[in-house]
């Protein structure tokens, strides 16, 4: 296949201007301080597509724009389009991504800026094919959403008013004519539902842009364009610190041996003094000084830094997250010429892969501690990245932390997150598995494409490598699995000649096995690299049970029963999941009362699974699992509730099984934590930040110390699982009772939970537990107590939920203020007459933060649930609604 056209010459103008700028006359180093002029305000945008303007003339006028931003959100702010997430608006708004757009800015430049030797226009991110001109002169053409574009601009700037124009081309319309002329099209992840691209001819694979924006099986197709990251003008005289990084070749309890590494751009040679100031989390700062000689061009500097008995950064649950601050400065004759700062935590990271009785391990070892990874996969927080605030990021990460997660996998079909995101992860002790941005498609064999990716990887690794939260760089998502197992790709491969198959796959192996690996090994050698997920680091086929990581989709994707999870024990489960709908309040944000049925056009539009095979595949799959496990939903609201119950209980089964098989299994990352829009998906937190039942379950099944009670083939294994680093004394109570609360049998045991291990306690057959009782009216409860306080509970059922003879629980409730918690603190007391399974508490339209939900309540038991709400007591009582399995199915 010939080279991709936009990669062969788009930066020629940029190169020429760069050479001219670097050959300019010298200026004193004393003027070298970097000056930054933000250029984020005052932008305007318009539709620059004559054909599209015929249908949308109002968009062809210049209007105010937001930078950073996207065309779609600018149109929304201008009230030129409706809410993209509402109803069927997705289909109505596809024209935006198929059109070209222009952004312009008038800005002033003062004489002091123009007197600087170096003046650069810096775009931190352009989405994606942009032609940039300054004062009517072409400056650059860009082709990668994930790269920073630093454009020498002095030759084109003038004193006073300047005009910057950015023309953005539709990535679909730009690439499609070229692709249609090629011998073949690489199979993409998902074909468009809207007819703008022929089936099997997806352009997304060829474009360095967030792949999810072309549509996924959990999100809409909104192909964005825009200036999606900040813009600024930078000026300096001869000297700029291009990069500053703290390497951590050795960190242990006794010493941290670090290296302050700088890359300095100098316009001419000369001497300077390099100072590195170290500010520990506690105690006095200290400074290291070294005299250096700089050559013209790029200079690599390194200063060893030794810290005795460092305060190390630990993952959540294993210790604190102290951060050190490092400041590097270059001075001459006491005058500071340039400086840079970094904050980082000191820790060691190992991806341990050792031969053992089950094959080869896959375990993250942080500061010498083997950490069982508990968490989820994370996708972008919105279809439109500029709407993602730091507050939304922090809220989502807090949701993960409050659910006892310690790791998130940042999936490769989105975009590299902002610095703020990783700062929050650092502070919360959340480990980050960071994919490079490849979402699951075979990639072009073009060498220019690979070079573009290499530059992208260098920039992103350099930007993010000082975050202690990042403990793995992974080449991408499901690329090898795609090549080996996906039906569409297998059919595509069969049409290629053997030579072309070899050429194409060899290029992909080079990208993930050499190019990206080489970038990480050079730029962040203290963090492991993993070629593709799932896989064994390209050492064999993907999807192996005894080596590497696994994506397990026989459940849901293959319609296997959820009990299949109990027979699946990979070394690390990095994807598995079940779908559900968000709660009714979230559904009301995109659907009206008339839409609340599964076959309505609106509900179909917000269910993306399996749409290529038909509009009802996803909802039919949900109904299949609900009916199999729980019965027939009695109405739409019950369907929504049961979808969450099914998801939560199914994922709990899998996660509990994986934790109970430690150290054979050392990771559980379910798919997925969050959403980009409101609709059916695998998430545990919906796009509004509301917790589904799964998130409440995760808080329990990911607890540092918990009990597992796993029943298969008529036998139940009960064990205590501990992620603590010290032994823990506990008591285990087993109680068998009928649904009316009559105790049939009880048992107790004292146990010392082994650290970082599973402690088996009981193995009981059904006959031993039931002793002749009706299995449809009997449950076994296992409770774990530490220092007399119940910290975990598991319920064992002897029949599927649909066969349980549940009665009306007879809920009794009491709402009382919690004087110790503040003005918005309450406690909700719930008591039942008979056993209540999967109790869901909601307050209708009121925003209420519940400390617990989605729980079982035994007959006669009163539970107290803390909550926070600003509503009045009357409103809370009026809107309180309790639901359970007993009243949600047709009986």
Model regions: which residues?
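Short glycine/proline/serine/threonine-rich loop/turn segments at secondary-structure transition edges
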Residues: 114-117, 157-161, 309-323, 768-778, ...
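Substrate-binding/catalytic cleft of secreted carbohydrate-active enzymes
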Residues: 407-427, 431-605, 646, 650, ...
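Extended carbohydrate-recognition surfaces in non-catalytic/accessory domains of CAZymes
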Residues: 32-122, 198-230, 234-239, 354-358, ...
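Accessory beta-strand-rich segments of carbohydrate-active enzymes
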Residues: 39, 46-48, 78, 98-240, ...
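Short acidic/polar inter-strand loop motif in beta-rich domains
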Residues: 169-176, 332-337, 785-792, 887-890
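Extended acidic/polar, glycine-enriched regions
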Residues: 155-161, 261-355
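Active-site-adjacent substrate/metal-binding segments within catalytic domains
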Residues: 77-109, 114-122, 127-134, 140-143, ...
